[in-house]
């Protein structure tokens, strides 16, 4: 039986102070190698908090978090997971710290212990794979929103993660950048959990779907455009519409 990269077992998560009601309760989740999970739900239901809990940035109030079967309890226990699980934040600017694209993308490999030459080669290779060849000398703050998002993804992928956590990756992207990101993720074998309100995007890049209902994580299925007859709340005459 294939061992999950990470798993959560009966996890409850709450914001401080301690008496606060849980944001999520009795969460059971595992991510297998090569698995692509799409996570959706209304704003404020705890999706981002769940990703932060996986990486130890928000600690569970109860339950067990495992990485390759090992229970994570102390801060130092999460180090190996954070090196192996890449987290792409909603706002790309939160992950871009250096003047040039090359410096940003090479930062992760350098932290993993690669030499400057190896980190540069890894960064250039990753930029090329994402269609960003020639970007290495560009100033990060002058990039478009879509370009910044791709560079932040490149910075994570340059670390060769076992899994990705993507928080609203299409947020603020124009149609061209969204399509480019969709094409990249659709062919990327790396295991991942993707949060998105963009249904079309989520169904193209995910193979399993989950949502959050009443503070609990549930398996779900994607919605598709359809037509049906029903009584409209502003009138009793049945009518047809396209979603």
Where are these regions (language model features)?
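Conserved ABC transporter NBD signature motif
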Residues: 63-74, 81
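Helix-to-loop junction immediately C-terminal to a conserved catalytic motif
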Residues: 55
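Conserved ABC ATPase "signature" region
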Residues: 117-135
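The feature captures the beta-strand-to-loop junction immediately N-terminal to the Walker
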Residues: 40-42
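Catalytic Walker B motif of ABC-type/P-loop ATPase nucleotide-binding domains
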Residues: 164-168
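H-loop/switch region of ABC-family ATPase nucleotide-binding domains
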Residues: 196-197
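Conserved ABC ATPase signature
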Residues: 139-143, 147
